[in-house]
Amino acid sequence: MTHLLSALVLLLQTQATSAELGYRFTLPSGFTAFPEGRAQKDMVDCWSEATPVSAHGAMILCVQRMHGVLPREAMKPEDLPASTQLVSFKWKEFDLQGLRSLASQQGGEQAFVLVTQVPLRREAVQLFLSGPADQEVRGQALLSETLASLEGESNWLTSTERAGRLGTAAGWWIAIAVAVIAVLVWKRRRAA
């Protein structure tokens, strides 16, 4: 019975997918399509809260394509504008860097913006989550939950994959060294 309820809950959750970019994730509860957000360049899709929790407006979640893969080099705080801070998010076993910023909207209301880049194998994407400043803590939790549900292959190697490749490379170098030594010993014996 518990498995049936779990399966039903999963079916009721809305999934965002892109076969072209190779990802799938569960949309936060209460978020619905926001086609106006796709008007910006390279936006794949956007969603907003159907019923905003805050009286100051709805939160918006968007996916933007990056037209390339993401390297592992870290951003430096000194390269960021003064109003932007580095934050971190978890995806699979990777620590992703993100940006947090507060901005003034029309009418003087403050809004937060959270951005993180996801190193998908086919093409990296950026996830944006923005909303009223009074919802920032909730927004951070929603972006973390979204990343936790995001499925897709990464172009980054996990620590296990890196160790495996290092072990394979070391094995080849050892095999080459043994072969060279064997040839030298064989030549010496023939010359003697």
List each model region and its residues.
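Sec-dependent N-terminal signal peptides
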Residues: 2-12
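Cleaved targeting-peptide boundary
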Residues: 11-21, 183
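Secretory pathway targeting signatures of secreted, lumenal, and periplasmic proteins
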Residues: 19-74
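Surface-exposed amphipathic alpha-helical segments
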Residues: 22, 28-33, 122-166
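Signature of long, low-cysteine stretches enriched in small and polar/charged residues
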Residues: 29, 36-37, 74-120, 177-180
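Short, surface-exposed beta-strand/loop "edge" segments at domain boundaries and coil↔beta transitions
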Residues: 51-59, 67-73, 107-112, 124-125, ...
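Short, solvent-exposed aromatic-acidic interface loops
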Residues: 64-69, 76-81, 130-134
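C-terminal single-pass membrane-anchor helix
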Residues: 158-192
